[in-house]
């Protein structure tokens, strides 16, 4: 771990995974003091992700302390392709990236992180994907003295965090009638939601992934969701996160049998459904699974005092039933002044890739599904 001091603050660069593992308690305390935390920056999620996907020697986690107390952190890693880049830990299986700043010392912490990042990125471009518009990383971008660029990234759909029945009650006309009918169908069948305790998480993850595979039978499933490393990551991370309240697992049972399972993640103002699995027999019974799941996650968000219910990445048409607001994540590129040509090159690479994707999707509509599946693969530095 390398370190330097500036303005009474100690800035360190953690490159050792064991040292990162030892940060759990103070990292989680900082996560709770942050104004804009997402579940994907929890220590449980990042530590587990690195075990499954990280590469030795690539860890680059910036830490800021005042009098020994952690007040800022940026969980990054080094990749070499297509060029040297500092990118977020968490890869493509994480929907959002942010830095962590102690809310009471955010100004000092972000300034120190900026200075630390300037040193850590002496020969690299910083490429921060999936940054929410209100993220703390926006403060870092705003104060960055070197070259920078803001690009658009994934679109997410969001709703206010309130019980779904309340939202449906305000809907008028045929749309409201259809949604109320779908909810009554679930209730009439007697499907019951059961929260899974921490010690039940390993078995519940196995059930969720089996149901997820079954629901995609005959269609193009994200292959990463069927791999052992992904299952192992969820078992490790979600077990801890259920314990500290940043995750919830819910099984839906019909006559005692699990017919659907859902994993939701939450922290700060945000709750979102991350992954689910459902028995195809529910479709045969005309059950609207997305409506059933959304009602449960919305209730969790409301009960937990959250203000935002995120439908996470993707603007699929079925999400529009509820009248969500689209929120576009951003991609922030940063570099030292002398590395501006490299930043512009990276900017061009991203633009060319996006144009190619749009061209293929326009000329070959069937490729849209393939692109969405492949875009979800955990390719580091994507």
PLM region spans:
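Conserved acyl-donor/pantetheine-binding loop and adjacent beta-alpha core of acyl/acetyltransferases
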Residues: 75-98, 342
């Amino acid at each position: 771990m390398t370190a330097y001091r500036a303005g009474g603050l100690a800035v360190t660069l953690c490159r050792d995974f064991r040292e990162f593992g030892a940060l759990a308690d103070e990292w989680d305390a900082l996560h709770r003091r942050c104004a804009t935390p997402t579940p994907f920056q929890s220590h449980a999620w990042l530590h587990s992700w690195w075990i499954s996907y990280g590469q030795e020697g690539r860890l680059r986690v910036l830490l800021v302390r005042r009098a020994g107390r952690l007040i800022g952190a940026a969980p990054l890693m080094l990749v070499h392709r297509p060029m040297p880049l500092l990118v977020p830990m968490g890869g493509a299986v994480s929907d959002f990236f942010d830095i962590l700043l102690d809310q009471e010392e955010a100004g000092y912490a972000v300034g120190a992180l900026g200075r630390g990042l300037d040193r850590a990125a002496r020969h690299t471009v910083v490429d921060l994907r999936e940054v929410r518009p209100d993220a703390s990383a926006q403060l870092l971008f705003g104060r960055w003295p070197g070259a920078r660029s803001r690009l658009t990234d994934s679109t997410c759909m969001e709703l206010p965090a309130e019980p779904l029945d309340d939202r449906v009650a305000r809907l008028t006309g045929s749309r409201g009638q259809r949604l109320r009918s779908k909810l009554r169908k679930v209730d009439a069948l007697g499907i019951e939601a059961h929260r899974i305790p921490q010690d039940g998480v390993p078995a519940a993850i196995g059930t969720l992934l089996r149901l997820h595979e079954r629901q995609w039978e005959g269609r193009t499933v994200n292959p990463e969701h069927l791999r052992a490393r992904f299952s192992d990551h969820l078992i490790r991370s979600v077990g801890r996160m259920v314990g500290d309240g940043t995750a919830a697992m819910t099984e839906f049972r019909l006559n005692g049998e699990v017919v659907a399972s859902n994993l939701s993640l939450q922290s700060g103002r945000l709750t979102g459904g991350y992954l689910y699995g459902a028995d195809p027999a529910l479709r045969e019974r005309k059950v609207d699974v997305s409506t059933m799941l959304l009602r449960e996650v919305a209730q969790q968000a409301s009960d937990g005092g959250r203000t935002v219910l995120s439908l996470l990445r993707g603007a699929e048409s079925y999400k529009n039933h509820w009248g969500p607001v689209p929120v576009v994540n951003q991609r922030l590129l940063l570099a030292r002044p002398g590395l501006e040509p490299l930043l512009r090159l990276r900017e061009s690479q991203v633009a060319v890739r996006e144009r190619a994707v749009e061209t293929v999707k326009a000329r070959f509509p069937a490729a849209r599904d393939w692109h969405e599946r492949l875009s979800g693969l955990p390719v580091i530095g994507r």
